[in-house]
A protein has these predicted regions:
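Signature of dsDNA virion morphogenesis modules
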Residues: 1-199
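Active-site-adjacent segment of 2-oxoglutarate/Fe(II) JmjC oxygenases
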Residues: 202
Length: 202
């Protein structure tokens, strides 16, 4: 199965991440933490319901399964591309661009905090229960729309972020295992199984 690296062409105006979407099944296999419901003890009395989401926007070197018109393949983002995507997201003032399931534009959504994980063991995201590798792009999003929070976040209709944007691709291998990503592929397969169970066994 072909493996493509996704890259950013800085000469293309639309290249990179243009928006974040709230989705039921994040392709990167990482759910968010709803800080209105799960608060660290030190902040528990500050605000009962902050309506803030924290989660991974992009995880580096993690193969993501794709099927387009019957063609199956994997894509991945390098650590360098993840960092560049995060930087350009803010440079182009896209922090208020959000959608629901990649279809419905949302208002009142703002990414106010963003960072690249340097040391997973001591990263801020760890205290909120996120377990992501070095190089992951983590964001915090304020949800000002109470209807979205109540109907989709609190009711567990969406579970994570999914990026929207345009990327170029480079074929890196006709077999993902050739570049030493077999463990990540196994993780990706497990994520697909978990998604199937979540969607079909309720």
């Amino acid at each position: 199965m072909n493996l493509y690296e996704m890259i950013i062409d800085e000469n293309e105006l639309m290249s990179g991440v243009n928006a974040l979407s709230l989705v039921e099944s994040p392709a990167i296999g990482s759910d968010w933490v709803a800080l209105g419901d799960q608060k660290p003890i030190l902040l528990a009395e500050v605000n009962a319901d902050k309506q803030i989401l924290m989660g991974a926007a992009l995880i580096p070197d993690k193969p993501i399964y794709r099927n387009m018109n019957g063609e199956e393949f994997y894509i991945y983002f390098s650590e360098e591309t993840v960092a560049k995507a995060a930087e350009m997201f803010f440079k182009r003032s896209n922090q208020s661009n959000a959608t629901l399931e990649h279809s419905q534009p949302l208002k009142g959504m703002t990414v106010f905090e963003s960072w690249i994980v340097d040391n997973p063991e001591f990263d801020k995201s760890k205290q909120y229960g996120l377990d992501v590798p070095k190089g992951t792009w983590v964001v915090s999003m304020k949800v000002d729309d109470k209807d979205i929070w109540d109907n989709y976040i609190k009711n567990n209709k969406v579970f994570g972020f999914s990026i929207e944007g345009a990327f170029s691709n480079v074929l890196r291998s006709e077999s993902a295992e050739d570049i030493g990503l077999s463990d990540q592929l196994l993780d990706g397969a497990l994520d697909l199984i978990r998604t199937f169970i979540k969607e079909n066994i309720n």
